Curated annotation (Swiss-Prot):
<keyword id="KW-0472">Membrane</keyword>
<keyword id="KW-0812">Transmembrane</keyword>
<feature type="domain" description="PQ-loop 1">
    <location>
        <begin position="27"/>
        <end position="93"/>
    </location>
</feature>
<feature type="domain" description="PQ-loop 2">
    <location>
        <begin position="150"/>
        <end position="205"/>
    </location>
</feature>
<feature type="transmembrane region" description="Helical">
    <location>
        <begin position="123"/>
        <end position="143"/>
    </location>
</feature>
<keyword id="KW-1133">Transmembrane helix</keyword>
<dbReference type="InterPro" id="IPR006603">
    <property type="entry name" value="PQ-loop_rpt"/>
</dbReference>
<keyword id="KW-0677">Repeat</keyword>
<feature type="transmembrane region" description="Helical">
    <location>
        <begin position="62"/>
        <end position="82"/>
    </location>
</feature>
<feature type="transmembrane region" description="Helical">
    <location>
        <begin position="174"/>
        <end position="194"/>
    </location>
</feature>
<dbReference type="GO" id="GO:0016020">
    <property type="term" value="C:membrane"/>
</dbReference>
<dbReference type="Pfam" id="PF04193">
    <property type="entry name" value="PQ-loop"/>
</dbReference>
<protein>
    <recommendedName>
        <fullName>Mannose-P-dolichol utilization defect 1 protein homolog 2</fullName>
    </recommendedName>
</protein>
<dbReference type="InterPro" id="IPR016817">
    <property type="entry name" value="MannP-dilichol_defect-1"/>
</dbReference>
<feature type="transmembrane region" description="Helical">
    <location>
        <begin position="202"/>
        <end position="222"/>
    </location>
</feature>
<feature type="transmembrane region" description="Helical">
    <location>
        <begin position="88"/>
        <end position="108"/>
    </location>
</feature>
<keyword id="KW-0813">Transport</keyword>
Length: 235
């Protein structure tokens, strides 16, 4: 008995017999359900960050390079899934995250006026290359290499922001809710990857996500306290 690719027969059979499903039956089911929950949650994961920027009309403390690299990483991941003909449940999360990441970068550019001419080279280059990558019209070997590099891209997408936070002793307009959801999502992906026996490279990527998102989340908690104290003192 399958629902959305989830085999429910094992769990339903156990419950009909008045028994609680065994671990080997329950864990894969939980893994699949969590995977679909992540796809649903990805629709809103970056909205708190976008809303915070628009509300405050400020991008103080945000590293534009970090968010640009996120766009590149999501584009490569989505293109690879489309190229392999995977079902929407496998790449839907990346599609929603890419759309939100593009809106987020656009907001950063808008509230960073005037944007240097050299900065515009990066989005123009992306617009020129992204359609070709998403259409899968590149050398297969290069495609595999790009996909293999995505974990490094996501790692380097976080490092500039972590360093900027440390240097400024402030997280500026970073959204706690967005990075909390990123952190929680990475933990869930580690669990689902272990259950589905994903390749070690994929598991490593999600583990790095736990570390980097956890680092930024910790910085938000640490550096927001002095800022709140200063604001209270000023009042």
């Amino acid at each position: 008995m399958d629902y959305l690719g989830i085999d429910m027969s094992c769990a339903i059979g156990s419950l009909r017999n008045g028994d609680f499903p065994e671990k080997d039956c329950l864990l894969p089911l939980i893994s699949k359900l969590l995977g679909y929950c992540l796809v649903a949650a990805s629709i809103t994961v970056k909205l708190p960050q976008i809303m915070k920027i628009v509300q405050h009309k400020s991008v103080r403390g945000l590293s534009v390079v970090a968010f640009e690299l996120e766009v590149v990483g999501y584009t490569i991941s989505l293109a690879y899934c489309l190229h392999k003909g995977l079902p929407f449940s496998a790449f839907g999360e990346m599609a929603f995250l890419l759309i939100q990441a593009l809106i987020l970068v656009a907001c950063i550019y808008y509230y960073s006026q005037p944007v240097p001419v050299t900065t515009w080279i990066r989005p123009l280059l992306y617009c020129a290359v992204a359609p070709t990558v998403l259409a899968g019209q590149i050398n297969p070997t290069l495609f595999e290499a790009l996909y293999a590099s995505q974990h490094a891209i996501f790692l380097f997408a976080r490092l500039p922001q972590i360093w900027k936070n440390f240097k400024n002793k402030s997280t500026g307009e970073l959204s706690f809710l967005t990075f909390f959801m990123n952190f929680a999502g990475s933990i869930v992906r580690v669990f689902t990857s272990l259950q589905e026996k994903a390749p070690i490279s994929i598991l490593t990527g999600f583990a790095l996500g736990v570390v980097t998102n956890g680092s930024i989340l910790t910085q938000i908690l640490l550096y927001s306290k002095p800022a709140a104290a200063k604001e209270k003192k000023a009042n």
